[in-house]
Amino acid sequence: MTRAAAGIVYAVVFILCLVLGIVPTAIFVSVMSGLCCYEFFRMTRLDGKMANERMGIAAAVVFPLSALGDSMLLNALLFALMLAVGIWYVWSPRTRISDVAVTLMGPIYTGFMLSAIVLLRDAVPGFAGALLSVGVCASLWVSDSFAYIVGSRIGKHKMVPKISPKKSWEGFAGGILGSVLIWLILWATHFYKLSLPYALLCGVVVSILGVIGDLIESRIKRGVGVKDSGNLIPGHGGMLDRSDSLIFGCITAQLLLMIGGVL
């Protein structure tokens, strides 16, 4: 399967789940989170960290499911994870504090953060909710695509060459433009209490946080000496490689929409 075909299949399945409703969305994000967490632990293993992988992956899988209907369950699970990891640390003399930190970071970085997609889908009923959640994710995908196209054509000024050599400031600007275009479409539907200036702000900020998410994952990969987090998706690497911008971008969108009174 080619890179383009793999990317299309991933996007179609993702969008279909968002359109079908909150339960398919939660199940898809749950599976995605579990795979991302597994890949995260796989990379940290290369750095000598011995996380409690079963506990971490289980939490990553359950986080999005706990976001169904009541965000308080999400907070309760976060407390339960902290408690369980603390008990594991107390009763495991050989466990290092770095192992504890990685065990906590894995599911929080993946499952907890990605649960924002479920909360977004659940916040607005019907077609408008499906469109909003698809639009938020699409703004990050389009941002990535625009950044790649612009950066590969005219990118000359590198952002952080030691972490992500291909990223340029020109591509960064192109990515923001792509994200803003999607947010303008959301504004133009008039389905939401979204003013034009606030739609522009959301487009810019969400794109920037998506790039930060991408750079964080690139830093992890660079630190452990791997090119991709995995090989699950042909031409794209692992699930974490496909989700890195969503991890920070979607929760940023959710917070901005809550602050702006849209949700």
Predicted regions and their residues:
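Hydrophobic side chains within alpha-helical segments
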Residues: A6, R42, A147, E217-I220, ...
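Hydrophobic transmembrane alpha-helices of multi-pass small-molecule transporters
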Residues: S179-V180, R242, G249, M258
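Membrane-embedded alpha-helical bundles of polytopic integral membrane proteins
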Residues: M1-V204
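Juxtamembrane boundary at the C-terminal end of a transmembrane helix
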Residues: L255-L263
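Interfacial loop-to-transmembrane junctions
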Residues: G223-L246
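Membrane-embedded alpha-helical segments of transport systems
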Residues: S143, A173, L240-F248
